[in-house]
Amino acid sequence: MAPIPVTLITGFLGAGKTTLVNELLRTPGPRRLGVLVNELGDVGIDGELMGEEADGVVELTSGCLCCSVRGELSDSLTSMARIEPPPDGIVVETTGLADPGPVIDTVAWLPDLLRLDALVTVADARTCLRLLDDPELGEARRQVELASTIVVSKSDL
């Protein structure tokens, strides 16, 4: 079996990551997607918004993907990749506070099962420059630096 492509969706809080994931899930086509959602809050709103479009939504709520839940992320990705039949792709939506580097590393540690297909960073047009200039928000800069694609959201507001 060829490694399953993983699309990592990052972006700072409120940028529109879940909206983008929902659009990916609604895109017609004969494909099965697995979705992993990282939520830091007590209520996993993002997972609830996914609705029934996803073939499998796994919510990681015990911490940020970039640090405390790396083992849980690896376990969840491995389990999802081994579902029969396996998904055609896996979408991982990080919390807005995540440095994507460790998540990329986790995918790289599973080369027989997974390959990083894209790192998409969603940037809110109204707040992006301010966030990138804030020295305390290195995660925002890192999300943009590592992105293979940047989607500018809310440009019409």
Residue ranges and their predicted role:
Residues 2-10, 15, 19-140:
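Nucleotide-state-sensitive switch-loop elements of NTP-binding domains
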Residues 94, 122-126, 147-157:
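G-domain G4 guanine-recognition motif of GTPases
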Residues 100, 141-144, 148-152:
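Hydrophobic, well-ordered secondary-structure segments
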Residues 132-136, 144, 154-157:
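GTPase G-domain guanine-specificity segment
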